[in-house]
From Swiss-Prot:
Upper taxonomic lineage: Bacteria, Bacillati, Actinomycetota, Actinomycetes, Micrococcales
Recorded GO MF terms: rRNA binding; structural constituent of ribosome
Matching PROSITE patterns: RIBOSOMAL_S15
Keyword Ligase: no
InterPro entries per record: Ribosomal_uS15 (IPR000589), Ribosomal_uS15_bac-type (IPR005290), uS15_NS1_RNA-bd_sf (IPR009068)
Job description of the protein: One of the primary rRNA binding proteins, it binds directly to 16S rRNA where it helps nucleate assembly of the platform of the 30S subunit by binding and bridging several RNA helices of the 16S rRNA. Forms an intersubunit bridge (bridge B4) with the 23S rRNA of the 50S subunit in the ribosome.
Similarity section: Belongs to the universal ribosomal protein uS15 family.
SMART domains in UniProt: Ribosomal_S15
Pfam families tied to this protein: Ribosomal_S15 (PF00312)
GO biological process: translation
Disulfide-bond pairs as recorded: none
GO cellular component: cytosolic small ribosomal subunit
Organism: Renibacterium salmoninarum (strain ATCC 33209 / DSM 20767 / JCM 11484 / NBRC 15589 / NCIMB 2235)
Name of protein: Small ribosomal subunit protein uS15
Length: 89
């Protein structure tokens, strides 16, 4: 379940560090968080959709790796992003 273009643009506008920034860890983590939230809602309705559950676990792992990278490179940006997204860490 990919994100719609309008939703992507909104996330990029909100979390980008520069004007043409689409690949910073903040933007990537925010997009992954939105997809994870959408898939979690899907799985609440479709409990036996194990194929989607496996994809969800892959997205969670990718987000975790990006968060670890951001934490290792710039702890202040990491803490600000965690607070903005409301993630537990």
């Amino acid at each position: 379940m990919a994100l719609e273009a309008a939703v992507k643009q909104e996330i990029i506008k909100e979390y980008a560090t520069g004007e043409a920034d689409t690949g910073s860890p903040e933007v990537q983590i925010a997009m992954l968080s939105k997809r994870i939230l959408d898939l979690t809602e899907h799985l609440k309705v479709h409990k036996h959709d194990h194929h989607t559950r496996r994809g969800l676990m892959a997205l969670v792992g990718r987000r975790k790796r990006l968060l670890t990278y951001l934490k290792d490179t710039d702890i202040t940006r990491y803490r600000a992003l965690i607070e903005r997204l409301g993630l537990r860490r």
